[in-house]
Amino acid sequence: VESIIKDVKGDYIYPSFIDLYSDYGLPKAKKGEYNYRPQYESNKNGAFHWNESIHPEINSAEQFVYNNKQATNYINSGFGVVLSHKQDGISRGTAVLVSLSDQKEQKTVINDKAASCFSFKKGVSMQKYPSSLMGSIALLKQLFLDAYWYQNSNNTTNLSFNAFNNQFDLPHVFETSLVTDYNRIYQISDEFEIDFIIKGNGKEYQRIEEIKSYEYPIILPLNFPLNYEINNPEESDILILSKLKHWETAPFNPRILSENGLNFCFTMSDLEKPSDFIKNLRTSIEKGLTKKDALHALTLAPATLINEENRLGTLEKGKKANFIICSSDIFENGKIYENWTNGIQNIVNEKTENDVRGYYTFTSENVSKTFTIT
């Protein structure tokens, strides 16, 4: 294998980051045509589950296609690998672990079945049921019961149950929309003796003692609320205290999880602007998250959660060539020069040949001025 030697004296090098909650490279789910008659049965042909929001047979790897625009957003923020799944329905099927390199899919797919994914969201299904959170929970519990029963059944074939039963050895990722979803997931986890990795919602601080007791690993978004613009007294009356409290406390959420000993990693999911990721990450550090914990949450923690710590997450011989080169400490004001994914160079910011950054003092007679070039 040919090697490349580069002089990066004075630069900072980190392992490329890993995002465990993405829909990168996958088509968006689309709703069917509206029918004024209520739909109670599945319109999906084949020996599948009777409800369209239950589709564990979906294998995201079979639908994955490289997407340059999405990949660029991730690469510019320091990511090299993402776990991608089709974010639709309650039982969503398997996620694919992929490199963000601009290569054929045969080269970028790292693990075609890296996790199975769940939520309480019905998705684009046009069936009447479920029509509530309670219905979604009941349907998911029934799926577990039916799949267990199916293991000993010889008189029927159900491809959804087949797929579901084959996923028990995979990591299980469960999306939350509300902070109260943690308890709902725990009830399912406890009843069916299954562990979950929780995709969080940024409000974990509100019930930290309860969440701490569950000991779930958490995929944490950095979707901090923007500043509220209040131009007159009437607008201030509309703004409720809970929103102001969340605006103030949300940036402390990673620190609070860390101080309570919870295992977590970061995701770009839920950000309106992908470019805000590094900015919000630095805000978390300003609010008390240590740089060591931040780096762990971006690299080795996610790699370990999906059992890929032998190939990803650190800069070691034998691991994939995924790393970023930065001008200085990325957790302060470092600029990403290059992001190498799968051994392929991606230029993020051009590096000037003559680096003129620094402090300069200009003296003229009795006047002395100091300037900073960053």
Listing of model-derived features with the role each one plays in the protein:
Residues 320-353:
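C-terminal cap of metal-dependent C-N hydrolases
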Residues 67-205, 330, 335, 341:
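Polyanionic/metal-chelating signatures
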Residues 189-195, 212-219, 261-263:
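Glycine-enriched alpha-helix->loop->beta-strand junction motifs that scaffold or abut catalytic
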Residues 7-9, 35-69:
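Aromatic/His-enriched, Gly/Pro-containing loop or helix-boundary segments
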Residues 37-49, 57, 171, 221-328:
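His/Asp/Glu-enriched, well-ordered alpha-helical/loop segment
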Residues 352-372:
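Tryptophan-anchored aromatic micro-motifs
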Residues 1-16, 31:
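Histidine-rich, glycine-flanked metal-binding segment
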